[in-house]
Curated annotation (Swiss-Prot):
Pathway field: Cofactor biosynthesis; biotin biosynthesis
Requisite cofactors: pyridoxal 5'-phosphate
N6-(pyridoxal phosphate)lysine carried by residues: K242
Disulfide bond sites: none
Function, in words: Catalyzes the decarboxylative condensation of pimeloyl-[acyl-carrier protein] and L-alanine to produce 8-amino-7-oxononanoate (AON), [acyl-carrier protein], and carbon dioxide.
Origin species: Trichodesmium erythraeum (strain IMS101)
Record-level GO BP terms: biotin biosynthetic process
Catalysis: reaction(s): 6-carboxyhexanoyl-[ACP] + L-alanine + H(+) = (8S)-8-amino-7-oxononanoate + holo-[ACP] + CO2
Coiled-coil region(s): none
Alphabetized CDD domains for the sequence: KBL_like
Assembly and interaction partners: Homodimer.
Entry's EC annotation: 2.3.1.47
Broad class of enzyme this protein falls into: transferase
UniProt-recorded name of the protein: Putative 8-amino-7-oxononanoate synthase
Length: 393
């Protein structure tokens, strides 16, 4: 028997290092935006989820300061005890309006929303069908639920249909779970087809709108709005920490669903309520995206400019460096392995670009992931293209 029960940690760390999977934090020394300061150097930021550039917006900052002055720095308890403020309820009403649902519920993070909701609506007698590219929080929520999990190959509707045909009748409840925008590839789920299958096989459907909220849809309502599926029966989950520039998560759906979750979801019941500052910032962000659709339009214009610049430089498509589909502001450049990805990320930094390597186990294959923002200027996009060209030669 080993003398030290913690000795395995050193061995595990060594394995992580050998696989080039080791991670460490990088300290950003500036306010969020298209230009950031890292290690004393200004870089163009292509690694942020701040799609609409709201995290550094003075109106969000002012709202957070005012809420802190009025309500304090923390909520001090769970929402069912001392942690509820009127501003929480106001935010939930605005989310429900944005998502065009009967009701909504705010969580302290998107991760907590996913694991809490999934493990509340299904359990050991039930079936979960999950896209293989789903976010970690969706996968861990499925595991926590104790339900039977079937992972279907990415966006493979025929495979999913076959599994529902074979397995659905053996279980009490069925839940299909998917990201609407897949965060590490940038492609979209086939939402209308998933809704058809859910209806046909008496299955619930949960869609994680983390990277779609504020970005997709004529009003910023996400992929549900983008695909004209508003009003359909489904569970919508999202985050306040990406395009909304704050922190927290939400679930939107029917009044009965939200009342049930408020009474049964441990990650909401037993967690301190979202801080007044984060709540106020998110509330302000929703109001801004409704009043300023030009922010969203500028984001999509930047994507169009980037695609045009990219496609005129055919060198980038040589040597197997074929990019992902252009369905969202997330563009991926697949690479051979973690070592190559780390080298490319470092070379980009030397060219004034911050777009670090994405490696296993976060993803199956290594890549550079580019995230566009509405606050990027055309010159920023041109500098990125120039840097990519230099690397491809």
């Amino acid at each position: 028997m080993q003398n030290n029960p913690y000795s395995w940690i050193e061995s595990s760390l060594s394995t992580i290092h050998k696989a080039n999977w080791y991670r460490s934090v990088k300290t950003i020394e500036s306010i969020p935006g298209a230009i950031i300061k890292l290690e004393g150097k200004k870089l163009i930021n292509f690694a942020s989820n701040d799609y609409l550039g709201l995290a550094g917006d003075e109106r969000l900052i002012a709202a957070a300061i005012q809420a802190t002055k009025e309500f304090g720095s923390g909520s001090t308890g769970s929402r069912l005890l001392t942690g509820h403020r009127e501003i929480h309820q106001e935010l939930e009403r605005e989310i429900a309006k944005l998502k065009q649902t009967e009701s909504a519920l705010v969580f302290s993070s998107g991760y907590l929303a996913n694991i809490g909701v999934i493990s509340s609506v299904v359990s050991q007698r039930d079936l979960i069908l999950s896209d293989e590219y789903n976010h970690s929080s969706l996968k861990n929520g499925a595991i926590l639920s104790g339900a039977k999990i079937i992972e279907y190959s990415h966006n493979n509707i025929e495979y999913l249909k076959n599994k529902l045909e074979q397995k659905r009748e053996n279980y009490r409840r069925s839940l299909i779970i998917t990201d609407s925008v897949f965060s590490m590839d940038g492609d979209l789920c086939k939402l209308p087809l998933l809704l058809d299958l859910a209806e046909k096989y008496n299955s619930m459907l949960l869609v994680d709108e983390a990277h779609a909220t504020g970005v997709f849809g004529i009003n910023g309502g996400g992929c549900v709005e983008h695909f004209n599926c508003t009003g359909k029966q489904l569970i919508q989950i999202g985050t306040l920490s990406k395009a909304l520039g704050s922190l927290g998560g939400y679930v939107a759906g029917s009044k009965n669903l939200i009342e049930f979750l408020r009474n049964r979801t441990p990650t909401w019941i037993y967690t301190t309520g979202l801080t007044p500052a984060d709540t106020a910032a998110a509330l302000t962000a929703i109001k801004i995206i409704k009043k300023e659709p030009e922010r969203r339009m500028k984001l999509w214009q930047n994507l169009e400019i980037f695609i045009n610049l990219l496609e005129t430089e055919s060198q980038l498509l040589h040597k197997g460096k074929k990019t992902s589909n252009y369905e969202s502001p997330i563009i991926c450049f697949p690479l051979k392995n973690a070592v190559e990805a780390l080298k490319v990320g470092e070379k980009l930094k030397q060219e004034g670009i911050f777009a670090p390597a994405i490696r296993p186990p976060t993803v199956n294959t290594s890549r550079i992931r580019i995230s566009l923002m509405s606050t990027h200027e055309t010159s920023h996009l041109q500098q990125l293209i120039a840097a990519l060209i230099n690397l491809s030669q």
